[in-house]
């Protein structure tokens, strides 16, 4: 069944913001949007001419109709015109969270001022928001002006952004996304911030030069809501929302005499529309004065790989390395997780020797020091290793670097390093590693491949067996990595033949 997302917000007669923008954005991400209208605005591209709040009785009737038949996975809230509306919505949300079998995620975009500068509330609602609504909100998505209105913190630099986010959290909000469209720092760039589960995420991209920005805030929060309803983690929803808005700004047009609306396109398919993940040591990180940890060693642009990796066997012993190479598996990875194994260095050296003997590509998982020492073809690292591995040493040694990614945020983070290949997973649940909350599935893989395939060889990994391998290969991914499909097969040799046939490897 299609995911249902509600928008509790105002109507924009000009069609650029409010529930009109919400529904377009939700549709672009394949979810069904429902609405409860809080206000009817008379507006066009030049501004808001009047604001007409809907009575609480009519709002409640809309909510009761929806909840009786079409409960939401996520509820996005936009313009609330007065204190009575805030109190009513808070009462309903409290009941949903207490009684629904699957309590909804609440995304709140605190719309107070239109792009044109016109006020969008009948009265000062800040105190009522802090008292009644914010303690129920899972994700709040204010812009610069709305952040300052709610917190009293003026966003004059990164530390002020962090301070404002913590102030919002103190009101009971669970996670914060602060939109940087009005914060021109560094000049010519749009910097956005997210705080979620004790971690911060910064995104940046060059500002899109267009005056047609009406509805960007509504649309971004609606994309985040749609993605959350489909199981994306917030950091990925944040990324996709930004990419969608960037694409929409590039395609935006004028329909009247004033500011045009952001365009609504589709799932963002061009890497040029995606923001950069800002990290310590990067140019934007330096501009924002991010502290660089002592152990952090940034490097980018690793040795390339010719062609695709094909069937990729990930195994934990030298014997399995030899069996795979003997049976014409051209890419293998030695994954020994026991760093205290007394034969660790011996096994790594032998695996590299076998790779040279059979003409195969042998990647060493994690143990980059020994991989350098013994001249491995390459190293495979996880995201957590990027903070501690000596990436310059790996690059200077000429080793190829493969990186694991689990979703779109990690994909873009890995892209900063320009590795030799990118692995995306886990595609399916797997018993070889705890991937709770990180199962990607075929739908996400189908989006990942066209984004990255022109940049790097791509690898799909996680829970892939013979029965699943052909549908994984059909996404266009360049390599299919397997573990148990070979090591637990009755005949590993025949399993290799069958797998290569299934993925179309000659």
Predicted regions and their residues:
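Charged C-terminal helix
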Residues: 50-53, 69, 236-305, 501, ...
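Short, small-residue alpha-helix embedded
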Residues: 20, 25, 148-149, 210-234, ...
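Catalytic cores of alpha/beta
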Residues: 362-377, 406-418, 449-454, 458-459, ...
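Glycine-rich phosphate-binding active-site loops on the catalytic face of alpha/beta enzymes
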Residues: 36-42, 255, 335-336, 383-391, ...
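Hydrophobic faces of well-ordered beta-strands that scaffold small-molecule active sites
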Residues: 33, 106-108, 140, 307-315, ...
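Conserved phosphate/ATP/ADP-binding segment of small-molecule kinases
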Residues: 121-200, 350-420
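Short glycine/threonine-rich catalytic loop with a Thr-x-Gly-x-Asp
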Residues: 13-16, 205-224, 461, 488
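Alpha-helix-loop-beta-strand connector modules within alpha/beta enzyme cores
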Residues: 345-366, 383, 391-406, 438-466, ...
């Amino acid at each position: 069944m299609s995911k249902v997302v509600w928008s509790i917000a105002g109507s924009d007669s000009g069609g650029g913001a409010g529930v009109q923008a919400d529904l377009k954005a939700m549709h672009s991400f394949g979810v069904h949007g429902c609405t409860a209208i809080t206000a009817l605005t008379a507006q066009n591209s030049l501004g808001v001419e009047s604001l007409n709040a809907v009575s609480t009785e009519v709002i409640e009737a809309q909510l009761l109709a929806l909840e009786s038949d079409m409960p939401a996975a996520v509820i996005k809230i936009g313009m609330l015109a007065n204190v009575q509306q805030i109190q009513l919505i808070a009462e309903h949300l409290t009941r949903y969270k207490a009684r629904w079998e699957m309590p909804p995620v609440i995304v709140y975009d605190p719309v107070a001022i239109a792009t044109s500068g016109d006020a969008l509330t009948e009265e000062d609602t800040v105190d009522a928001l802090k008292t009644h609504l914010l303690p129920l909100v899972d994700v709040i998505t204010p812009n610069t002006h709305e952040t300052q209105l709610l917190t009293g913190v003026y966003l004059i630099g990164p530390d002020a952004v962090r301070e404002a986010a913590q102030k919002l959290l103190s009101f009971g909000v669970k996670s914060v996304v602060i939109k940087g469209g009005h914060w021109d720092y560094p000049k010519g760039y749009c910097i956005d911030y997210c705080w979620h589960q004790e971690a911060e995420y910064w995104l940046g991209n060059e500002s899109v030069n267009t005056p047609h920005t009406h509805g960007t805030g509504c649309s971004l929060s609606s994309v985040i809501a749609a993605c959350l309803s489909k199981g994306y983690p917030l950091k990925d929803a944040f990324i996709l929302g930004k990419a969608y808005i960037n694409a929409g700004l590039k395609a935006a047009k004028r329909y009247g005499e004033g500011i045009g609306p952001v365009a609504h396109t589709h799932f963002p398919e061009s890497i040029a529309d995606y923001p950069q993940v800002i990290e310590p040591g990067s140019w934007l990180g330096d501009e924002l004065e991010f502290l660089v940890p002592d152990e952090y060693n940034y490097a980018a642009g690793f040795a390339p790989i010719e062609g695709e990796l094909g069937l990729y066997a990930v195994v934990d012993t030298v014997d399995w390395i030899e069996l795979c190479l003997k049976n014409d598996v051209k890419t293998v990875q030695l994954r020994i997780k026991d760093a205290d194994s007394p034969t660790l260095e011996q096994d790594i050296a032998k695996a590299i020797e076998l790779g040279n003997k059979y003409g195969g590509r042998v990647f060493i998982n994690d143990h980059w020091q020994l991989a350098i020492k013994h001249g491995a073809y390459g190293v495979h690292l996880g995201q957590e290793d990027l903070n501690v591995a000596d990436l310059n040493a790996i690059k200077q040694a000429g080793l190829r670097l493969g990186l694991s990614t689990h979703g779109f945020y990690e994909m873009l983070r890995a892209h900063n390093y320009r590795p030799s290949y990118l692995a995306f997973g886990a595609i399916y649940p797997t018993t070889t590693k705890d991937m709770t909350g990180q199962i990607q599935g075929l739908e996400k893989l189908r989006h990942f491949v066209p984004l990255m395939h022109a940049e790097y060889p791509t690898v799909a990994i996680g829970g892939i067996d013979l029965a699943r391998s052909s549908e994984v290969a059909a996404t266009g991914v360049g390599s299919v990595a397997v573990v148990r499909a070979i090591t637990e097969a009755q005949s590993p040799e025949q399993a290799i033949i069958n797998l290569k046939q299934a993925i179309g490897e000659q």
